[in-house]
Amino acid sequence: MAAKLMHAIQYSGYGGGTDALKHVEVAVPDPKSDELLLKIEAATLNPIDWKIQKGVLRPLLPRKFPTIPGTDVAGEVVQAGSAVNRFKTGDKVVAVLSHATGGALAEYAVAKENLTVARPPEVSAAEGAALPVAALTAHQALTQFANIKLDGSGERKNILITAASGGVGHYAVQLAKLGNTHVTATCGARNLDFVKGLGADEVLDYKTPEGASLTSPSGKKYDYVVHGASGIPWSTFEPNLSEAGKVIDLTPGPTAMMTFAWKKLTFSKKQLVPLLLIPKIPNFEYVVNLVKEKKLKTVIDSKHPLSKGEDAWSRIMGGHATGKIIIEP
């Protein structure tokens, strides 16, 4: 049985950064019929978490205040709703919680059965918790938008991955190489060797003239760009794209949406495509299995106890994490 109260981190309004995070004791949530109550073993943060706090998606998210942030968790099922049939008490799982409700920075959380997958013993809680948003975003960008076959059977393509040392980026490099693509990647100078070690064929320091211009050292034009960085205008991408090259924007803002619309209206072959993550169980199970088979690795930037969750929040806000930031109750 779960305890009646749990430790959690909340914030009660927009803005404030780490100073607005409060450690509280709150009631353990009750699962609905299609939900699981999880005892959290590890959670991870994504940039969208602090952006929601900042108010980027107001008034849509969060749905109410106070809110417990975070969506990516691994844990053990301690209670299953009456309509749940894929899991039982004691099962180890990985889940993505709704951004509308959050809940990851706590000792317990409720997860929808249809957003939860089994975690095999070969995958640690930290490795599992790191996957949902970051690995699924990379997977969706490459398979749905770039049409890459991750078994390597498709036509060889040239891919650019920006912010390649971050959460999404480090998965995207590995998945793209499974798909037999030529990968050019950008990152900071301190991470050049790290990104090469993930399998990238060419790595650019984004602060150098070559990196800032996104020019392939071998002169290749990019069929697809998996774009997770910020502040790069369309005019920088366009001359580096192949005839029908596409930029897949993982964090589209108003300018990106205007570019997307304009390129559609003018029937341009070169396109900017905004990505909205749609988690799907088969994809979720696929990336977990890749970790199990040691074909995909989770690189952990740092681990923090829940009692020092504000340190993890500060780290994700800084924007320079290498891999994933883990919080453990």
UniProtKB/Swiss-Prot annotation:
Keywords: Chloroplast, Membrane, NAD, Oxidoreductase, Plastid, Plastid inner membrane
Domain of life of the organism encoding this protein: Eukaryota
PTM comment, free text: The transit peptide is not cleaved.
A GO term for molecular function: oxidoreductase activity
InterPro entries: ADH-like_N (IPR013154), Chloroplast_QOR (IPR052733), GroES-like_sf (IPR011032), NAD(P)-bd_dom_sf (IPR036291), PKS_ER (IPR020843)
The protein's Enzyme Commission number: 1.-.-.-
UniProt record similarity statement: Belongs to the zinc-containing alcohol dehydrogenase family. Quinone oxidoreductase subfamily.
Protein name per Swiss-Prot or TrEMBL: Quinone-oxidoreductase homolog, chloroplastic
Lineage: Eukaryota, Viridiplantae, Streptophyta, Embryophyta, Tracheophyta
